[in-house]
Swiss-Prot record:
The active site is at C352 (nucleophile). Keywords: 4Fe-4S, Iron, Iron-sulfur, Metal-binding, Methyltransferase, S-adenosyl-L-methionine, Transferase. The lineage of its organism: Bacteria, Pseudomonadati, Chlamydiota, Chlamydiia, Chlamydiales. Changing R334K: In strain: L2/434/Bu. This is Uncharacterized RNA methyltransferase CT_742.
Length: 396
């Protein structure tokens, strides 16, 4: 059923959903048509598979971040920051995209903030203020929570540990199924990358997620900064599509660029001969290695930039298949150049940003690849965004 019974009370102001929840079918068709028009120069329409709708339409998000906000007059809100100008803090009391108990977590945090009026909201342009965000992650096995409070790491805005522990205890007293609580301190300095100092306050150091394809289930430990697809059921459909696109016979070598916590490679490992993962983020590599061991999978992971890995291995035997699932900015030119020198037979490109994806697919097509098939999957209902998976094959 491609509709919802009502719209969220914050629709139109919070900056989250850009189309009414009650009009999902029409908004999905609009997104699909836009994607067809965008990729028309590269692929015949009949090779674009029908978009896979999001399921469930409501309460399916496994992660959401909420922001602390404060006006110059001192009015405080916890929720979303509107995209309007001037920006406004929207005190979210309902969100149809995530488990409704997330609102209990926000309400507990609001009460704690009210009890400590000296704590100010963080203001990124000036790197001032104490409270940044609260992130709620939901496990799909026990519907339990990981909660991450992010505050400023600047000494003059630091939040004392005993105040943090008050917040922690309020959450634990609520009776909510909380698996783990983390406190992150954001360390920002001009002309330097932002880093985080993490304190594990309570419970397990990870949240459990389970994904299955072809009846095979794999368990994943997701840590505070692990990337995981935002809709667990849609993630299974993404990986199932990748498997169908590569059509493995069991003798292939598969290179998983931007492998993150190893999820794609681990789920595809039973179908190919060898899996190699490449990831730049140390925390993600640690998670990947943990998940590889957890699932008894033979997969090698390199802590390396994708460009450097491709450059270092450009003269070695080419992998049969390369799966790339890069950030929204894409692979970028130099990484793409070295990937082309590796000349894999098949490339599966997964992207949440089709504008970047088509630019890089155009380069691949110019250099001897053909875009064979395309499968859009909706992970972001009621927004303008689509996940898109394309299969490119090297012309002989």
């Amino acid at each position: 059923m491609l509709s919802c019974y009502r719209n969220c009370k914050h629709f139109g102001v919070c900056g989250g959903c850009s189309s009414p929840q009650m009009e999902y079918a029409s908004s999905l068709k609009t997104k699909e048509l836009a994607l067809h028009n965008l990729f028309a120069p590269l692929i015949p329409s009949q090779n674009i598979l029908p978009v896979i709708p999001c399921s469930p339409l409501l309460r399916g998000r496994n992660k959401m971040e909420f922001s602390f906000y404060q006006t110059v007059d001192g009015e405080k809100t916890l929720g979303f920051i509107s995209p309007s100008k001037p920006k406004k803090g929207i005190p979210i009391t309902e969100c149809l995209m995530i488990d409704e108990r997330a609102m209990d977590i926000l309400n507990i945090t609001r009460s704690w903030w009210t009890a400590h009026p000296d704590l100010s909201a963080y203001y990124p342009p000036l790197n001032k203020g104490s409270l940044c965000t609260i992130t709620v992650r939901v496990g799909n096995i026990s519907n339990d929570f990981m909660i991450i409070l992010t505050t400023s790491g600047r000494e003059e805005f630091a939040v004392p540990l005993n105040i943090i522990q008050e917040w922690q205890q309020s959450l634990l007293d609520s009776g909510l199924p909380i698996t783990s609580i983390f406190w992150e301190e954001k360390l920002s300095a001009r002309n330097s990358p932002t880093t985080f100092r993490t304190t594990h306050l309570y419970g397990a150091p990870f949240l459990k997620q389970q994904l299955s394809i072809d009846g095979r289930s794999s368990l994943f430990h997701i840590r505070p900064r692990s990337f995981f697809q935002p809709q667990s059921l849609q993630a299974e459909k993404i990986i199932q599509t990748i498997k169908e696109f590569i059509d493995p016979c069991g003798e292939e070598t598969l290179l998983d660029l931007y492998c993150g916590a190893g999820i794609i490679g681990i789920l595809l490992a039973p179908y190919v001969k060898k899996i190699i993962g490449v990831e730049l983020v140390p925390d993600a590599v640690a998670s990947a290695q943990e998940n590889i061991q957890l699932n008894s999978v033979d997969m090698e992971v390199f802590l390396e930039d994708a460009k450097q890995f491709c450059k270092r291995n450009e003269n070695l035997p080419s992998p049969d298949i390369v799966v790339i699932d890069p950030p929204r900015c894409g692979m970028q030119n130099r990484a793409l150049k070295y990937l082309l020198r590796m000349a894999p037979k098949k490339i599966v490109y997964v992207s949440c940003n089709p504008l970047t994806q088509i630019q890089e697919c155009s380069v691949l097509v110019e250099q001897g690849y053909q875009l064979r098939r395309m499968q859009p999957i909706d992970q972001f209902p009621h927004t303008n965004h689509l996940e898109n998976i394309v299969l490119l094959e090297r012309l002989s």
